[in-house]
UniProtKB/Swiss-Prot annotation:
Name of the protein in question: ATP synthase subunit a
Signal peptide: none
Source organism: Cronobacter sakazakii (strain ATCC BAA-894)
Family statement drawn from the similarity comment of this UniProt entry: Belongs to the ATPase A chain family.
Originating gene: atpB
Cellular component terms (Gene Ontology): plasma membrane; proton-transporting ATP synthase complex
Role summary: Key component of the proton channel; it plays a direct role in the translocation of protons across the membrane.
Length: 272
């Protein structure tokens, strides 16, 4: 179904919630209105925009670092320095280990998630219209953080780092004891401890990914509802106030993802 064939608000909303997918068995684009009953599909729009925004972050920050001056900085350099100072201060307050990786990781997470969230402020029909009429794409979603696959993948990366730092700082034996001898320090309670600590450990990446996804999906859906249910000449009455409020949500969700990552890695680096 193309944008020109959409005749009802329900069809409009459904159209904008479809991802551009590729079937990994045939390497062909998936018809969003007749999807195959298979797990082997890939949301290539989410991957494309997340990679492009990640590269944009690297290019912009490298350019600032390359042309940084000790004199009066420009506006963009000042903004970058404020972000770096803010993230560095957050890491110093919350992480008590000695790893030099945490501050760059926190900066990358904050800016990358912020840029992905920021895509939600683009006009709903702009890039999907270009994708359909210029490139012939059957669907296109432009907010990577509104895709649960992206947010859980990022959370999985954080989870791997949690395991890495837990084993690095405590050793395999210390990490095993943490899972089996807490909170009840007696061998008879090892099965119960393992269940409790296992659930606690696994809940960290799940809650981290789902929190970001849920907030950004809801924000995207509200923009789609406004565009799909109201006539074009009255949409700005709700779009503008919601966009202003959504800027706070965008920034807050990037900050929360960064903070929880720092806290989880700090917990992994410390003894209970």
């Amino acid at each position: 179904m193309s944008a020109g064939e959409i005749s009802t608000p329900q069809e409009y909303i459904g159209h904008h919630l479809n991802n551009l997918q590729i079937d990994l068995r045939t390497f062909s684009l998936v018809d969003p209105h007749n999807p195959p009953a298979t797990f082997w599909t890939l949301n290539i729009d989410s991957m494309f925009f997340s990679v492009v925004l990640g590269l944009l972050f690297l290019v912009l920050f490298r350019k600032v670092a390359k042309h940084a001056t000790s004199g009066v900085p420009g506006k963009f350099q000042t903004a970058v320095e404020l972000v770096i100072g803010f993230v560095h201060g957050s890491v110093q307050d919350m992480y008590h280990g000695k790893s030099k990786l945490i501050a760059p990781l926190a900066l990358t997470i904050f800016v990358w998630v912020f840029l992905m969230n920021l895509m939600d402020l683009l006009p709903i029909d702009l890039l999907p219209y270009i994708g359909e009429h210029v490139f012939g794409l059957p669907a296109l979603r432009v907010v990577p953080s509104a895709d649960v696959n992206i947010t859980l993948s990022m959370a999985l990366g954080v989870f791997i780092l949690i395991l890495f730092y837990s084993i690095k700082m405590k050793g395999v034996g210390g990490f095993t004891k943490e899972l089996t001898l807490q909170p009840f320090n007696h061998p008879v309670f090892i099965p119960i401890n393992l269940i409790l600590e296992g659930v606690s450990l696994l809940s960290k990446p799940v809650s981290l990914g789902l929190r970001l996804f849920g907030n950004m999906y809801a924000g995207e859906l509200i923009f789609i509802l406004i565009a799909g249910l109201l006539p074009w000449w009255s949409q700005w009455l709700l779009n503008v106030p919601w966009a202003i409020f959504h800027i706070l949500i965008i920034t807050l969700q990037a900050f929360i993802f960064m903070v929880l990552t720092i806290v989880y890695l700090s917990m992994a680096s410390e003894e209970h």
